[in-house]
Amino acid sequence: MVLALLLPTAAMAEEAKEGAPKVAYITLSPPFVGNYALDGGPRLRVYKADVALRVTGDEAAKAVQHHEPLIRNQLVALFTQQTVDSMSNVEAKEHLRQEALKQVQQVMEAEEGKPIVEDLLFNNLIVQ
């Protein structure tokens, strides 16, 4: 009897899932590679960042892919401005991730009228 009562609930939950927009992760490829801490010091510092953006819905994914050159430009500028301190520990990297998300959302707001990107993930971040 309990099973019979749960079946309609499970069916309704499945229908809701089918109608809901799907989350997508868009990998910005190729990875970002460049120099940072360009303060005139004797040592050349290099970063490599594999970045993915989380969006919900096909339209959001298409918009991000359409504006990928602008997004990449903004992120390259941000990464290049970093100092040794801002790339050297976990807390600093988390702050960089949040700032990168904010800047990507600003690009999308300017181009599409809404932030669209829900999260930015570093799949890999290497600094030397």
Ranges and model annotations:
Residues M1-Q128:
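Flexible, low-complexity charged segments
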